[in-house]
Amino acid sequence: VINKNSEVYVAMENKEKNTSEDIKLGEQIILSGFQGLDGGSMVILRKMIGNEVRKISDKCEQFETIRLVLKKTHQTEASEVFEVNGNLTDNGKHFNTKVEERNLFLAVSKALEKLHHELEHTRHA
């Protein structure tokens, strides 16, 4: 399914680790577990993720892919905790992170920041 207002589509083929439930932003950004979110949240997340990934890719030797996996944990009627696992592949090297937060946007932002920091730390070492 292609959304003409953005470059987001749901992958319909099972390739590598991609499932039919994955959302792809362009060719290099894969989101898993984000399917049940409302449209307004997804608009904000797409902008936020796109901007941060652009900064990350500028620091990469050869940016390949970034994958974010969202899980809801410790869900109660009053609140929920969002777990975001991130995986960045740069020139064959893998960088991983895991963040848990009560705020979805903060969880995604922190996961991307941690990947960015890990990449910079490795490049300067």
For each feature predicted by the language model, list its residue ranges.
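Polyanion-binding surfaces on beta-sheet-dominated domains and ring/shell assemblies
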Residues: 2-83, 87-125
